[in-house]
Amino acid sequence: MKLTIAIVLVTLTLFCRPASTEVCPSLLYVLGNLIAGTPSSFEATLEPFSPDEDMKEATSQLKTLVDTLSPKAKDSMLELMMKIIQSPECA
């Protein structure tokens, strides 16, 4: 649970940086695969960033948890992410 909260906070910070007018496409791709991709596609999206073994294990655990959510819950998460990105706070 702490890892999930940390990832959400970091993600929101990156999305809403005052100095940034764009969201990093790689981050969006990784988050999209976390929510809607297969475990292997999610792992593949992380490889360009050379995660160490602890990072791989942590993200694997997170993906396993996310995959227990219903399709409706996953869709709602993606919708919320888009609302956040498009909100005035992130403009």
Swiss-Prot record:
Q: Looking at the record's lineage, which domain of life comes first? A: Eukaryota
Q: Name one GO molecular function term.
A: phospholipase A2 inhibitor activity
Choose one Gene Ontology CC annotation of this protein and give it: cytoplasm
- Leader sequence segment: 1-21
Q: Does the keyword Secreted apply?
A: yes
Alphabetized PROSITE patterns for the sequence: SCGB
Q: Which GO terms describe its biological process?
A: signal transduction
Localization per record: Secreted
**Entry-linked PANTHER family:** SECRETOGLOBIN FAMILY 1 MEMBER, UTEROGLOBIN
How it assembles, according to the record, is: Antiparallel homodimer; disulfide-linked. Interaction with LMBR1L is controversial.
| Protein task | Binds phosphatidylcholine, phosphatidylinositol, polychlorinated biphenyls (PCB) and weakly progesterone, potent inhibitor of phospholipase A2.
Q: What is this protein called?
A: Uteroglobin
